[in-house]
Amino acid sequence: MAIMPYIRQGTVIDTLVILFSTWAFLGLIRVIRRRSNTTSLKGPPSESFIFGLHQIIHKSEDSDALYEQWAAEYGSVYQLSGPMGTKRVVLCDPKAILHLYSKDTFGFVQIGIIRAFHEKYFGRGIIWAEGESHRRQRKALTPAFSNVAIRNITPVFFDSAYKTKAAWDTIFESNPTKDGIIIEVQTWMNHISLDSIGIAGFSHDFGSIQGKPSAVLDVFDSFSSVQPDAMSTLMFTLAATFPIMLKLPNNRHALFAKLHQTILEISDELLESTRKEEEGKAGGGRGDAKSIIGSLIKAESANSHLRISQEEVIAQMNVLLLAGYETTSVSLTWALIELSRHPDVQQKLRDELSRFAATDPTWEELTNGLPYLDAVVHEILRLHAPLNETTRVVADDDVIPLGTPLQTASGNIVDRISVGKGTTVSIPTRCMNRLTGLWGDNAKEFVPDRWLNDAKDQLKSNEIQGYRHLLTFIDGPRTCLGKGFAVAEFKAVLSVLIRHYTFEFPDGPETKVVGYMSIVERPRVEGQDGAKVPLLVRRVE
């Protein structure tokens, strides 16, 4: 009897060793096959087997400049070393980028760990879906983001801006002797974005502009006060190689879990209240197909050929609430920063908007009738894209065409490259938006005039096929469904703020602004605690 535990323990250990060895052997076979089917490319040498070049990129003050430097040195398509000896192909060639985006969700899919992350914290919605599932969900959501739908909800954006104006005017009236007031603008832009997506998307007013407490706002704000610790960064770096890392606790995972639970509770409440409201209407209507929540309810109907499940409905609401809050608030904050740095641009924009003293621009005027507002908005979207990279995995062996031939690691000149199934491929989207070869020598500068007709026609950026030749909203089947919503809100809010206030840095236009990691990267005035951007605000007389 005494020998039995020893035998069982030895058997278990032997079994584990065999399983691990088999896993490692099969992994090695996959790596060898993938690399044998992938063109050998040039690239910078690895700094570490464990981290590859991840630490260099992560710690860089300007990772976009690194990507551009490597493209200049190794060619517009090159190879980077990743964690644990992995490799990825980086595309900075417009033709290659077009190829990837055109085959997105089928030929190129999300990295497994990213998809698992999306499922865990946001559900099986449109950002999780691939292939036919993604196509079905996108079709179900499209009516809510049509031009007609956005035109109908544009007054909501103006209303949020005027609520902010009322709150700021109250501050001014309580300080009548002061020449100007210091306002931390990023917090206010967060409130505008949250209230706008709540009302326009879900017929729910979070009331954050008026100071109403909000559980979801508290969770969003917590991301700006808790930076990723060393363990979070290490786990994120290694998660693609060791997916179990996603299950281990760390400070960021705890915040995402809390965010998921909070948004889930709010989504359930909003969906149920809307169902009851619609069921109470005469004729038993199923919601207005032109609103976000109405489209979701319609698509949930068993009679719809685009039917989506209740789980998918909740997942869409989670994603739309998060995206509607994060991205627009960051863009608005960057706009106020750049206009504070460039008072001449700020005044030129104010002059264009001056004809709207007694009324607001219509949606048509916001879209086509205010060229300088359009130029300022798109220059912000170009220079300060909220996300810096798109990463995909090759679903099946493929050949990617190149616009510019390059020399491979073996010395051959090629106009296309082969990528094996399982190869990781990434596009440095923000780098492409700032690439000197596409946008000119002033690509890193804030120059709205580049968007005016004569200047724009001369740029090589026309080779990029994305929205307005930008990759801010990416392209292809996964191009941002809400880009029209985001741009309309951006323009409406900015038009109100610039008509009524001037903005500048308290310590002058040379004030340093740095990146600060929240859910997405946010701006922060150096020296401030958290993602804060205090500006000196004056009323326009």
Swiss-Prot record:
GO terms for cellular component: membrane. The chain crosses the membrane at residues 12-32. Its main location: membrane. Its EC number is 1.-.-.-. Pfam families: p450. Heme binds at C480. Cytochrome P450 monooxygenase; part of the gene cluster that mediates the biosynthesis of clavilactone A, a meroterpenoid that features a unique benzo-fused ten-membered carbocyclic ring unit with an alpha,beta-epoxy-gamma-lactone moiety, forming an intriguing 10/5/3 tricyclic nested skeleton. Cytochrome P450 monooxygenases claO, claP, claQ, claU, and claW are close orthologs, suggesting that a redundant function or pseudogenes are present in the cla cluster. These monoxygenases are not involved in clavilactone A biosynthesis nor its modification. It comes from Ampulloclitocybe clavipes. GO terms for molecular function: heme binding; iron ion binding; monooxygenase activity; oxidoreductase activity, acting on paired donors, with incorporation or reduction of molecular oxygen. SUPFAM superfamilies: Cytochrome P450 (SSF48264). It is a single-pass membrane protein. Keywords: Heme, Iron, Membrane, Metal-binding, Monooxygenase, Oxidoreductase, Transmembrane, Transmembrane helix. Belongs to the cytochrome P450 family. Pathway: Secondary metabolite biosynthesis; terpenoid biosynthesis. Its cofactor is heme. This is Cytochrome P450 monooxygenase claU. It is found in: Membrane.
